[in-house]
């Protein structure tokens, strides 16, 4: 089994919640903009806006072999970033389907919707 088979391109918000509760080591990468992050965020998420990815990709290089779950508002930007990271050799990267909006609806209603 290759890494992409082991790590499907998408993961549900429920599965991400289970990862967090199991203390599984992974990075939750928030690719929204700072203003969005200030409005609503998942505790422990690391902000790296999609608009800055090209210039800041080197910050992720030490994590190239780590499990990274990418999230945004609804899942569109995070899917683009997931695909971009996979295209440059990050093999354990997944998109959180539905983004923080689905997180608010299905996992943690205390996270504001916007």
Task: List each language-model region with its residue ranges.
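Short, surface-exposed ligand- or partner-binding patches at beta-edge/loop junctions that are enriched
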Residues: 71
């Amino acid at each position: 089994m290759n890494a992409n088979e082991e790590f499907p391109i998408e993961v549900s918000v429920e599965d991400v919640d289970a990862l967090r509760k199991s203390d599984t080591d992974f990075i939750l990468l928030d690719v929204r903009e700072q203003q969005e992050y200030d409005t609503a965020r998942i505790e422990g998420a690391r902000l790296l806006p999609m608009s800055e990815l090209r210039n800041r990709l080197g910050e992720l290089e030490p994590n190239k072999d780590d499990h990274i779950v990418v999230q945004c508002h609804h899942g569109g930007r995070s899917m683009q970033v997931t695909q971009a990271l996979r295209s440059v050799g990050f093999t354990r990267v997944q998109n959180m389907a539905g983004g923080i909006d689905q997180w608010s609806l299905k996992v943690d209603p205390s996270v504001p919707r916007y």
